[in-house]
């Protein structure tokens, strides 16, 4: 549990983050619909509240992997600057690291930096499915889960 920071202007565009033309309940509903469409397991077991660019995610009984994927999926929405993790996992597990993609990054380069081996990029790709559809489709500002080697 804790507060995770994201790049507010990067990510999936679900509403007009610049003019804020949606109320908080509408934003939370759009985020929940987005989560349900991703196919992340147990996405329907969380509750989301949005206030001033901060998403608070609550829930109980999720796996560590599902929890992290949900937090990353919520944080990688344009207009979300931080995610307050209030989700309780079913069993304690080691948390993954998070990595913010920079301009020019590739999964291979990130893998080399994190694991010391560029060929382990698929481990990062698999850890970020279904949010990532292809290992080549990452963008600056996107936050990725980096599982243990």
From Swiss-Prot:
Domain BON: 23-91
Key word Cell membrane present: no
Any GO BP annotation: response to potassium ion
Entry's free-text remark on domains: BON and LysM domains are both required for full K(+) binding. The major K(+) binding site is located in the BON domain and this initial complex is stabilized by interaction with the LysM domain.
Changes seen on gene knockout: Deletion mutant shows retarded growth at high concentrations of K(+). Deletion of the gene impacts the abundance of muropeptide species. The absence of YgaU leads to the activation of the Cpx pathway.
Job of this protein: Highly specific potassium binding protein that is required for normal growth in the presence of high levels of external K(+). May act as a sensor of cytoplasmic K(+) concentration. Binds a single K(+) ion, which induces a large conformational change. Can also bind the larger alkali metal ions Rb(+) and Cs(+), and NH(4)(+). May be involved in the regulation of peptidoglycan cross-linking.
Lineage, highest ranks first: Bacteria, Pseudomonadati, Pseudomonadota, Gammaproteobacteria, Enterobacterales
Subcellular location per the Swiss-Prot or TrEMBL entry: Cytoplasm
Name of the protein this chain belongs to: Potassium binding protein Kbp
Biological source species: Escherichia coli (strain K12)
Start and end residues of each LysM domain: 97-146
MF terms (GO), sorted A to Z: potassium ion binding
GO cellular component: cytoplasm
CDD domains listed in its UniProt record: LysM
Keywords: Cytoplasm, Potassium
């Amino acid at each position: 549990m804790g507060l995770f920071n994201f790049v507010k202007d990067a990510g999936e565009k679900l509403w007009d983050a610049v003019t804020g033309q949606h109320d908080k309940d509408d934003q939370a509903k759009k985020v929940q619909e987005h989560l349900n469409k991703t196919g992340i397991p147990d996405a329907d077991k969380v509750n989301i509240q949005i206030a001033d660019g901060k998403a608070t995610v609550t829930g109980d009984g999720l796996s560590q992997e599902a929890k992290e994927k949900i937090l990353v999926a919520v944080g990688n929405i344009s207009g979300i600057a931080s995610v307050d993790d209030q989700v309780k996992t079913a069993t304690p597990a080691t948390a993954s690291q998070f990595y913010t993609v920079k301009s020019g990054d590739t999964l291979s380069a990130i893998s080399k930096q994190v694991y010391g081996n560029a060929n382990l990029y698929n481990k990062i790709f698999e850890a970020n499915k279904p949010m990532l559809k292809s290992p080549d489709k990452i963008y600056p500002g996107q936050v990725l889960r980096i599982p243990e080697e």
